[in-house]
Amino acid sequence: DDQAYIDDKMRQEESENELVLQAMDSPYTKLLMEQFLLSYLDLMDKKILAGLQKNVYPLYDELKDLRGLNGVKEHLAYIRDKQDDYSKKNIAKYLKKSIEQYLPIVKRQDIEHE
């Protein structure tokens, strides 16, 4: 049914637009800009912003709960120093992979220090 397909497409677009607006308001977007991990061109890319809001920022929230905002800043400074040209072209994927690898380490450290 064409109408169902069109409705679904519109819902997806609305959902993406909502994620983009949330990402624009997010303190993490500002931190990524300050660390030069996001460029002004990335800010114009809906797919990147929606991807960050959906897949990366919830993980930053987890890190923030464990280590505070400074913990997030330190993580971003660290991964900025490790960044290569490939990751600049796939920034959302790079940021997601980096935090996914880092969070278990932080959680393990917390368990060891209890």
Task: Walk through the language-model features, giving the residues of each.
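Electrostatic interaction modules used in gene-expression and signaling proteins
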Residues: 1-114
